[in-house]
């Protein structure tokens, strides 16, 4: 298991992470805490939020800081990353988070996850897609070098609706956040109509390497959402990276 140390990100905020992944940790912190990429709507204090692709817990920590009374259902399949997620919840004394060590998909399965110890947030069930994406990155760039170390780990994948169906008296899902490195459509197709009807907002980050952008946008619109599209300013011009921000009509 990768070494984990506490990384100080601001005067009053630190997280546990693999120190070799510090570049990625700082990037995610900026994206969520400074650029506020998930501040897509005002949410109720007691929001119910789904974190698909929990990584080391940065999104969940941000939402719990902003909405302390919220309930968050989080999913992270990589064992080392899930362990770090749990340590970060303990570090910040967070309650109201139900974390599951699994990925989300259209059906239950056991699949091979390609894990990047120095870039764990890029770990993927679709390694070929990730390899194709990296072709648009200069191979001398630090990110390309950090992505060179990989290994495979077998992980469980389950349907999101199977978890939502076990939540007592679930009235609304105020936000579904999906950042799952190529498995976005799998996550969305693991939702039954009864649960789609409960969702108010969806934010999906995806790289359109296999036509999923149009498919995801069409699916979200068919479920009653107005979909806005943003391109992250950090993405290279030939990397088809998008944020789909879907709000219920």
UniProtKB/Swiss-Prot annotation:
Signal peptide start-end: none
Upregulation: Expression is positively regulated by the cluster-specific transcription factor tenR and is induced during cocultures with the natural competitor fungus Metarhizium robertsii.
Enzyme class: transferase
Entry annotated with the keyword Methyltransferase: yes
EC number: 2.1.1.-
GO BP: methylation
InterPro entries from the UniProt entry: FkbM_mtfrase (IPR006342), SAM-dependent_MTase (IPR052514), SAM-dependent_MTases_sf (IPR029063)
Keyword match Methyltransferase: yes
Gene null: resulting phenotype: Impairs the production of detectable pyridovericin-N-O-(4-O-methyl-beta-D-glucopyranoside) (PMGP).
Source organism, top-level taxon: Eukaryota
A Gene Ontology molecular function term of the record: methyltransferase activity
Record function comment: Methyltransferase; part of the pathway that mediates the biosynthesis of tenellin-type 2-pyridones, iron-chelating compounds involved in iron stress tolerance, competition with the natural competitor fungus Metarhizium robertsii and insect hosts infection. Methylates pyridovericin-N-O-(beta-D-glucopyranoside) produced by the UDP-glucosyltransferase GT1 to yield pyridovericin-N-O-(4-O-methyl-beta-D-glucopyranoside) (PMGP). The pathway begins with the assembly of the polyketide-amino acid backbone by the hybrid PKS-NRPS tenS with the help of the enoyl reductase tenC.
Name the UniProt record assigns to this protein: Methyltransferase 1
Lineage: Eukaryota, Fungi, Dikarya, Ascomycota, Pezizomycotina
């Amino acid at each position: 298991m990768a070494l984990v140390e506490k990384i100080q990100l601001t005067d009053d905020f630190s997280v546990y992470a693999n120190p070799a992944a510090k570049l990625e940790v700082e990037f995610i912190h900026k994206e969520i805490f400074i650029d506020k990429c998930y501040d897509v709507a005002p949410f109720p204090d007691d929001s119910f939020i789904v974190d698909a692709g929990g990584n080391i817990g940065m999104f969940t920590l941000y939402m719990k800081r902003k909405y302390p009374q919220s309930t968050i259902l989080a999913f992270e399949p990589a064992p080392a990353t899930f362990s770090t997620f749990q340590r970060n919840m303990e570090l910040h004394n967070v309650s109201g988070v139900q974390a599951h060590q699994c990925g989300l998909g259209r059906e239950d399965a056991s699949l091979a996850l390609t894990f990047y110890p120095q870039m764990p947030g890029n770990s993927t069930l679709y390694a070929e897609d990730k390899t194709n994406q990296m072709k648009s990155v200069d191979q001398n760039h630090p990110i390309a070098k950090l992505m060179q170390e990989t290994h495979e780990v077998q992980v469980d994948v389950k349907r999101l609706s199977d978890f939502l169906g076990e939540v007592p008296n679930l009235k609304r899902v105020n936000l579904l956040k999906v950042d799952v490195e190529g498995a976005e459509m799998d996550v969305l197709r693991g939702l039954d109509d009864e649960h789609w009807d409960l969702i108010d907002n969806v934010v999906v980050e995806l790289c359109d390497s296999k036509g999923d952008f149009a498919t995801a946008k069409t699916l979200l619109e068919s479920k009653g959402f107005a979909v806005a599209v943003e391109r992250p300013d950090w993405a290279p011009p030939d990397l088809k990276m998008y944020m789909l921000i879907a709000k219920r009509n």
